[in-house]
Swiss-Prot record:
[4Fe-4S] cluster 2 binds at C159, C163, C166. PANTHER family: LIPOYL SYNTHASE, LIPOYL SYNTHASE, MITOCHONDRIAL. It catalyses: [[Fe-S] cluster scaffold protein carrying a second [4Fe-4S](2+) cluster] + N(6)-octanoyl-L-lysyl-[protein] + 2 oxidized [2Fe-2S]-[ferredoxin] + 2 S-adenosyl-L-methionine + 4 H(+) = [[Fe-S] cluster scaffold protein] + N(6)-[(R)-dihydrolipoyl]-L-lysyl-[protein] + 4 Fe(3+) + 2 hydrogen sulfide + 2 5'-deoxyadenosine + 2 L-methionine + 2 reduced [2Fe-2S]-[ferredoxin]. This protein may be expected to contain an N-terminal transit peptide but none has been predicted. It is found in: Mitochondrion. Keywords: 4Fe-4S, Iron, Iron-sulfur, Metal-binding, Mitochondrion, S-adenosyl-L-methionine, Transferase. This is Lipoyl synthase 1, mitochondrial. Residues 142-364 form the Radical SAM core domain. InterPro entries: Aldolase_TIM (IPR013785), Elp3/MiaA/NifB-like_rSAM (IPR006638), LIAS_N (IPR031691), Lipoyl_synth (IPR003698), rSAM (IPR007197).
Length: 423
C-alpha cells in the first residue's frame, strides 16, 4: 500500500482519508517529485545524445565517429545498445601480468610527496593519465638511493591526436598553454629530490611550433633549479619539422626520447594519421646526426597489437640504423574499452629474447618485459651511467682540444717571435 501512495505513476488512487492526512500529502508530493525528476533526466539524456550525434556528423576529419569510440563486431550498428558487460578480450589475463599491489605504498613519504606536489601545482603526469601499472614502484622509489621518479606531462592533459592505444584525453581545441608551467614544473621537480626525471608532452598540433618553445622553456627552468639533474624528454614529432626538433635537441637535455610505438605495418591502425613510422625514424635519426651522436636517443615498442616476430626484429634494426642508443619493449594493455583490444600476451621469455637480440644489434641499453614502459625507472640506473660517461668523455675531449689549441697557439707565438727577431 505504501508504494501506491508514493508513486504517482501507479494506476490505483490513494484513498481520500489517506490524502487528508499530513503523511499522505507528503507522500503524494514526493511521488510527484520523483516522476518529474525521471522525466527531466530522460529529456536531458535525449538532448545530450542528439547534440553528441550532431557533433559527430559535423566532424570533417572522418576520425571522430561513434563507431570509433566503440569496438563493435562486424555488422552491428553503432546505434544499437549493448546489454551486459563488454569483454576485454577472449584470452584471460596471464599470471605474469597480474600484479600484487604493495601494501602501504600510498603511505610512503616519497609517494605522497610526489602526489601532493603534482596536485598542488595542478600538473599532469603520464603515470596517472596513461594508467601506468608501475606507478607505485616509480613514485615510491628507493628511499636510500633516491631513485623515485615521475613522468611529468607538460602542455596540459588534452592531446590533439587520437592514437587508438592511448588513454590520454583528446581535443582539437585544447586549453591554451600555461605561461607559468615551466616554473611550476621546475619547483615540483626540485621538491621531489631526485637526480633523474622524465618529462613528456601531449601533441599540440594546434600550435605553430607544436609546443617546441614551451618544452625548451620547461627544460631550461628545470636545469636552472638543479644543474646536476639528469633530464629525459619524451617528446612528439613536431609535425616532422626538423628545425623544431633541433630547437629541442639544443636544450640542456640528457636523453632525447621519441617513441616509434609499434611495427610499420600496423602503424596506420594504431597511431594517429598525423604520426607515421618513417617520420618517427627521421626525427630520431636527425637528433643523432645533428648532435653528432652526443645526445643519447631512446625509443619504445609495444607488443600485443598484431605484430609479427620478423616485423619486431626489423623495427629494432631500423631504430639502431637511425642511431638510437636505448630501447624499451613492453606489453600493450588495453587502458579502456574504447581503445584497441590486445591481440596477444607475449610471454616473458619472448621479452628476454628481444632484449638479447637488441643488445646483440649494438644498443647500449634495452629494458624488455611485460610491464616495462618507455619511462620505466629500471632503465634509469644504467642510462644515468651512460649519460655520465658521455659527459665525462665530452669534458675530456674539450680539455684535450683546449690543450692542443693552447700548445698550437704557443708554438705559433714562438715562431712569430723568431721571425720578428730574424727580421
Amino acid at each position: 500500500m505504501f508504494h501506491r501512495h508514493l508513486c504517482k505513476l501507479c494506476s490505483k488512487t490513494p484513498s481520500a482519508a489517506t490524502l487528508a492526512s499530513p503523511l499522505g500529502k507528503l507522500q503524494e508530493e514526493r511521488g510527484e517529485g520523483v516522476a518529474k525528476d525521471l522525466k527531466k533526466d530522460k529529456q536531458h539524456r535525449q538532448i545530450f545524445l542528439q547534440k553528441f550525434r550532431e557533433r559527430l556528423d559535423s566532424d570533417t576529419t572522418g576520425k571522430n565517429t561513434l563507431a570509433g569510440f566503440i569496438d563493435l563486431p562486424e555488422g552491428i550498428s553503432p546505434t544499437m545498445a549493448a546489454v551486459g558487460p563488454l569483454k576485454r578480450g577472449e584470452e584471460p589475463l596471464p599470471p605474469w601480468l597480474k600484479m600484487k599491489v604493495a601494501k602501504g605504498v600510498s603511505r610512503l613519504p616519497r609517494f605522497n610527496s610526489i602526489r601532493k606536489s603534482m596536485r598542488e601545482k595542478r600538473l599532469a603526469t603520464v603515470c596517472e593519465e596513461a594508467k601506468c601499472p608501475n606507478i607505485g614502484e616509480c613514485w615510491g622509489g628507493d628511499e636510500e638511493e633516491g631513485t623515485a621518479t615521475a613522468t611529468i606531462m607538460v602542455m596540459g592533459s588534452h592531446c590533439t591526436r587520437g592514437c587508438r592505444f592511448c588513454s590520454v584525453l583528446t581535443s582539437r581545441t585544447p586549453p591554451p598553454l600555461d605561461p607559468d608551467e615551466p616554473q611550476k614544473v621546475a619547483n615540483a621537480v626540485a621538491e621531489m629530490g631526485v637526480d633523474y626525471i622524465v618529462m613528456t608532452m601531449v601533441d599540440r598540433d594546434d600550435l605553430n611550433d607544436g609546443g617546441a618553445a614551451h618544452v625548451v622553456r620547461c627544460v631550461n627552468a628545470i636545469k636552472e633549479k638543479n644543474p646536476l639533474l639528469l633530464l629525459e624528454a619524451l617528446v612528439g614529432d613536431f609535425h616532422g619539422d626538423l628545425k623544431l626538433v633541433e630547437t629541442v635537441a639544443l636544450s640542456p637535455l640528457s636523453v632525447y626520447a621519441h617513441n616509434i610505438e609499434c611495427v610499420e605495418r600496423i602503424t596506420p591502425n594504431v597511431r594517429d594519421r598525423r604520426a607515421s613510422y618513417r617520420q618517427s625514424l627521421k626525427v630520431l635519426e636527425h637528433v643523432n646526426s645533428f648532435t653528432k651522436g652526443a645526445m643519447l636517443t631512446k625509443s619504445s615498442i609495444m607488443l600485443g597489437l598484431g605484430e609479427k616476430e620478423e616485423e619486431v626484429r626489423q623495427t629494432l634494426r631500423d631504430l639502431r640504423t637511425a642511431g638510437v642508443s636505448a630501447v624499451t619493449l613492453g606489453q600493450y594493455l588495453q587502458p579502456a574499452r574504447t581503445r584497441l583490444k590486445v591481440s596477444r600476451y607475449a610471454h616473458p621469455k619472448e621479452f628476454q629474447m628481444w632484449e638479447e637480440e637488441a643488445m646483440a644489434m649494438g644498443f647500449l641499453y634495452c629494458a624488455s618485459g611485460p610491464l616495462v614502459r618507455s619511462s620505466y625507472r629500471a632503465g634509469e640506473y644504467y642510462i644515468k651511467s651512460l649519460v655520465k660517461q658521455r659527459g665525462a668523455a665530452a669534458t675530456k675531449s674539450n680539455t684535450t682540444t683546449t690543450t692542443t689549441n693552447t700548445a698550437s697557439l704557443a708554438a705559433a707565438t714562438v715562431t712569430d717571435s723568431a721571425t720578428l727577431q730574424g727580421e
